[in-house]
Amino acid sequence: MSGLYRILVQLEQSPYVKTVPLNMRRDFFFLVVTWMPKTVKMNGSSFVPSLQLLLMLVGFSLPPVAETYGFNKCTQYEFDIHHVLCIRKKITNLTEAISDIPRYTTHLNLTHNEIQVLPPWSFTNLSALVDLRLEWNSIWKIDEGAFRGLENLTLLNLVENKIQSVNNSFEGLSSLKTLLLSHNQITHIHKDAFTPLIKLKYLSLSRNNISDFSGILEAVQHLPCLERLDLTNNSIMYLDHSPRSLVSLTHLSFEGNKLRELNFSALSLPNLTNLSASRNGNKVIQNVYLKTLPQLKSLNLSGTVIKLENLSAKHLQNLRAMDLSNWELRHGHLDMKTVCHLLGNLPKLETLVFQKNVTNAEGIKQLAKCTRLLFLDLGQNSDLIYLNDSEFNALPSLQKLNLNKCQLSFINNRTWSSLQNLTSLDLSHNKFKSFPDFAFSPLKHLEFLSLSRNPITELNNLAFSGLFALKELNLAACWIVTIDRYSFTQFPNLEVLDLGDNNIRTLNHGTFRPLKKLQSLILSHNCLKILEPNSFSGLTNLRSLDLMYNSLSYFHEHLFSGLEKLLILKLGFNKITYETTRTLQYPPFIKLKSLKQLNLEGQRHGIQVVPSNFFQGLGSLQELLLGKNPSVFLDHHQFDPLINLTKLDISGTKDGDRSLYLNASLFQNLKRLKILRLENNNLESLVPDMFSSLQSLQVFSLRFNNLKVINQSHLKNLKSLMFFDVYGNKLQCTCDNLWFKNWSMNTEEVHIPFLRSYPCQQPGSQSLLIDFDDAMCNFDLGKVYFLCSFSMVLSTMVFSWFSTKMIASLWYGLYICRAWYLTKWHKTEKKFLYDAFVSFSATDEAWVYKELVPALEQGSQTTFKLCLHQRDFEPGIDIFENIQNAINTSRKTLCVVSNHYLHSEWCRLEVQLASMKMFYEHKDVIILIFLEEIPNYKLSSYHRLRKLINKQTFITWPDSVHQQPLFWARIRNALGKETVEKENTHLIVVE
C-alpha cells in the first residue's frame, strides 16, 4: 500500500490530475484522473488507460478517512481540531481506541489510561502526528515498528510507565527531537535503540534503574544532534573510561545518583555548558577531572560531598554559575578559605548559589571579599539572624540577592550601603516584624523587593524611603491588618503590588493615591468587608485588580472611580448577593469603560438574583465568569450591555436539585460571543431559540447536565459553531433525539466530544445513542394517530352521553326504591310537617327570603309552613337524606326555576326526587315557579323538568308590581286549603 501512496503523491503534483479536494472531514476521499486525448509521458512511461483505471480503483480502495466528529474514547481540543485528547478513558486496546481519529491530527494525548502494549503499526494512520503523549499508562512492552509511519513526530512522551528495557522500538521516528522515558523501570538499553533518531535533541532517562553509564554512552554516541541528556535519579556510580565523544551535547545531569567520581578524562564533551552532579550520596567524591569540558559555564554540586581542593580552577575558566549549596549538613559547612581560593580563581563567575552554608554575617563578609558576583543566593541559612554591619560592601556589582528562608529579624541601611547596583532583593520567609527608618535607602536602583511571609503587622513608610526605582513589591502572606494613604508614599514608580493573603479588613479613601504608575494590585485572600468610596482613586494606570477570596458584599457608588484603564477585575469568592432584579441606583461597574475580563465566580451564597442593570457600562467586556455560584437567577436582559462579550462561563451553579435559571431572551444581544459554557448546572431542558442570536458562537459546552433531548431549535442559527459538548447528560434514545443523532453523525463543521460513547439513558438499556434504530421514527403514523384520536373522541362522546343517561336512570331507580319505602312509612306512621318544600338555587336565595317566605308564611291571609334548606335541614345528617326527608314530610314541592337553577346538580336531584313522589302518589305535588323566561332548548338536559312543563301548570313571576297579588293568590290556591295539622306545627330551625 505504501507504493500506491507514493504513486498518488506523484500524481497530485501532475497538472493532468484533478483532485477532488481531500476534505479530511469526509468519510471517503478519491482521485479522478482526467483522460487526455493524447498519450502523456510521465517519467518516461506512457500514461495508459489501464493505469488510469488502476489509480481510480486505488483511490476508492484506500482506507476511508475516519469520521471526524464521533469518537468513542477521544475528543478534539475545542480551539484546535488538530489536537485530540483521550485522557482518563480507561483505554486498554490502543488500536481500537484511536481507530476513528482523523488523519490530520497533529497532537495526540493518551495520558492516564491502562495501555500495556504498543503493537506494530499502532499509529500508521496518523502520519501527521508531531506530538504523542503516552505518560501515566502501564506500558511494559513496545513492539518493533510500533511507531512506524510517524515520520513527522517531534515529541514522544512515555513518562510514568513500566518499561524495563529499550530495544529497537523507535524505527521510523526520523524527525523526533524530544524523547521522554523518565519514571519507568529501565535497566537496559540496546546499543542501537536510538539509532533511527537522527534529529533527537533532548533525551530524558531520569528516575529509572540505570546503573551502567557505559551502556548509555554506547546507545547515544551516534546521535549527531543530541544536546540534552537527563540521567537524574538513577543508580550510576562510575563514569565510562573508554574513549568516547559527544560533540553536540550541551547539558548533562547526574543529579540524584550515587557517583563516586567526576572523572571525564576519557569522555570528550567539547560543547558541554551545563553539568549537574547534585545530591550524589554521602561519600566524598575525590576523583575529579573536568579538563575535557572546556566550555563549561554552569556547575551544580549542591548536596554533593566533594573536596574543593580537587577542583582545578584552571579547567573552569569559562564558568559563570556555580551551586555549592550544602543540603547534607552532616559533613559540616564548607571551609570558607577553601571556597574563597576556588572562587577567587574563577574570573568569569557571576552567579553563586550558597544555600545552607553560611554560619553568620562574618561568613558573608569573607565570601564577598573573594569574588565579584552579579547574583548571590544565600537562602535557607538558618544561622543568619541579623545583618547590620556592611556585610556586602565588597560586592558593589551585585545585582540580585536572595536571602529567603533564613532567620533574619533585623537589618539596617548599613547592610547594603555599597549595593548601589542591586535590582532584586528577596527577604521572604524570614522573621521581620518591622523595619527601621531608611532601612532600604541605599538601594537607589532596586526594582524588585519581596518581603512575603514575614510577621509584619504594619508598614512604616519611612523604612522604604529612597526606593524610587522600585517596580514590584511583594508583601503577600504577612500579618498586615491595616494600610492607609501614607503606607505607599515612597513608591512613585511602583507597577506591581502584592498584598494578598493578609488580614486587611478595610480600605480607606485614597489609600493608593501615590501609586500613579501602578498596573497590578493584588488584594486576594484578605478579610476585606468594607471598601470606602474612592478607595482606588489615583490608580489611573491600573490594569489588573484582584479582590478574590474576601468578604465583600456590596459596592459604594464611587468605588471604582478613576480606573479608566482597568482591564482585569477579579471579584470571585466573596459574598456578593442580590435578592431582586430591581434596577440599581448606582451600577457598580458603570465607570469601567475599558474592562475586558470580570470574574464573579464562587460567591459564598451565590449571586442569586442578578439586578437588571448590574453590568451597565461594560461595553468593552470580553470575558465574564459567573460559574461556581450556588445560585444564579438571570430572568431579565442583564447581558444586553455586553455587546463585545466573547467568552461567558456560567458553570457549576447547581445547588442540590435546583438548576440554573436563564431567561429565554437573555443572550439575544451577545452577537460576538464565541465561547459559552453552561456545564454542571442541573439543566433538564432548553428553551427553543434561546441561543439563536449567537451567530458568532464557536464553542458551546453543556456537559454534565440532565438534558434528555437536543433538537434543532436549540442550535438554530449557530452558523459559526465548531465544538458542541453534551457529554455527561441523560440523552434518551427516542424519536425526540432523532435529529440530534443524525446531525451529530453527519455534520462536517461541528465536533461533538465522545459522541460514540453516549449511552441510552433508559432503564436496563446497554445500547448507544449512535446505534439507536430510527426506523420506527420514519414510519408515517399520521393516519394511525388520526384514526385513533377520532375513535377515542367519538367513544368519549358516546360514552359521556350514555353514562349521563344511565347515571340519571340509576339515581332515579335508586331513589324510587328509597322514596317508595320512605313515603310509605311516612304515610302510615307520620303526618306532613310542611305544606311545601322549596327547591331553589343559592343565587335565588335572596328572592326566596325576601318575597316568597313573607308572602306565604306571614300576613293576615292563610299562611303555610315552608321547608327551606338552610333553616330546616337537620345538621349532621347526609344531605341526600335531608332532601329526601324534606320532600317526604312536605305535601308539595315548590321549584323556583331560573337559569342558575338549571345549572345546579342539587336542584336537579331535588326535581328527580319530587318527580318520584308524584309518580308514586299519583298526586299533583310539584309547583313550578319561573323567575324568568327560559327557552325550551335550555331545558333539554332537564328532561324531567321539561316533561313537567308539558304536563303541569306553571306560574311565572310577573315583572309588574300590580300583578304580584294575583301571582301569590295562584300560589296559595295551588298549595290548597289544607294546612299542616296543629300537632305537627313544630319546626326544625337550623342556625
Swiss-Prot record:
Where is each TIR domain found? 832-975
One GO BP annotation is: response to virus
Q: Where are the LRR repeats?
A: 104-125, 128-149, 152-174, 175-196, 199-220, 225-246, 248-268, 271-292, 295-315, 318-338, 348-368, 372-394, 397-418, 421-442, 445-466, 469-490, 493-514, 517-538, 541-562, 565-585, 594-617, 620-641, 644-665, 672-693, 696-716
Question: GO CC annotation: what is one?
Answer: endosome
Extracellular topological segments: 69-783
Q: Which residues cross the membrane?
A: 784-804
Q: At which residues is glycosylation annotated? A: 93, 109, 125, 152, 167, 209, 233, 263, 271, 274, 300, 310, 357, 388, 413, 421, 644, 663, 711, 742
Q: Per UniProt, what is one GO molecular function of this protein? A: identical protein binding
**Where does the signal peptide begin and end?**
1-68
Swiss-Prot/TrEMBL keywords: Endosome, Glycoprotein, Immunity, Inflammatory response, Innate immunity, Leucine-rich repeat, Membrane, NAD, Receptor, Repeat, RNA-binding, Signal, Transmembrane, Transmembrane helix
Q: Which residues lie on this side of the membrane: Cytoplasmic?
A: 805-991
Q: Where in the cell is it found?
A: Endosome membrane
Q: How does it assemble?
A: Binds MYD88 via their respective TIR domains. Interacts with UNC93B1.
**What is this protein for, i.e. what is its function?**
Component of innate and adaptive immunity that recognizes and binds 23S rRNA from bacteria. TLRs (Toll-like receptors) control host immune response against pathogens through recognition of molecular patterns specific to microorganisms. Acts via MYD88 and TRAF6, leading to NF-kappa-B activation, cytokine secretion and the inflammatory response. Specifically binds the 5'-CGGAAAGACC-3' sequence on bacterial 23S rRNA, a sequence also bound by MLS group antibiotics (including erythromycin). May also recognize vesicular stomatitis virus; however, these data require additional evidences.
Q: What more is known?
A: The sequence 23S rRNA from clinical isolates of erythromycin-resistant S.aureus is methylated and is not recognized by Tlr13 anymore, suggesting a link between antibiotic resistance and evasion from Tlr13 recognition. 23S rRNA modifications generating resistance toward MLS antibiotics preventing recognition of bacteria from Tlr13. These data may also explain why Tlr13 is not conserved in human: human may instead possess a related rRNA-sensing pattern recognition receptor that has evolved to recognize species that can hide from Tlr13 owing to rRNA modifications.
Family recorded in the similarity comment? Belongs to the Toll-like receptor family.
What is the protein's name according to its record? Toll-like receptor 13
Organism, scientific name: Mus musculus (Mouse)
Q: What is the lineage of its organism?
A: Eukaryota, Metazoa, Chordata, Craniata, Vertebrata
